[in-house]
Amino acid sequence: MNKFSKFCLELSSLSDIKPSIFLSPASGYRARCEFGISKNSYTMVEDGKRIYMDVSKIPHHSIQKIMPKLLKYINESSILKSKLFQINFRSSGSDVLATMIYHKKLKNEWSIEAKVIQAKFKNLSIIGRSKNQKITNDKENVKRICKYKNSSL
């Protein structure tokens, strides 16, 4: 007996509710994701091996759309590229937050360069992080408005 069948059996003694299974989409299902940065590419680790990529099918479509363009701008900027080792993406559906994590203290020139790159996207906010340091040029979170019975939540 699998977990779902066992759960249904246990629930049946408490309620008449019949649970259903809904499959997740095969791509674009992650609103949060983390990528390493190495050799001008995003990286992930699979089976102990580093995989290099420009885009991934796992994140939400809004993140997928931004990934290759942002990577291109990062690789063209020595200020943004220097000592960058990780990027975390968050998405609310349309808006995307990219947190760029560094192995060095960030200077004012980083903030200026990040603003220039951020201005090229209508739905991207960039945060810079380093040890004991956080630089925010715009929003530092993403919000999602959900509709329920003609009300916004």
Role assignments for model-derived ranges:
Residues 1-153:
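Accessory RNA-recognition modules of RNA-modification enzymes
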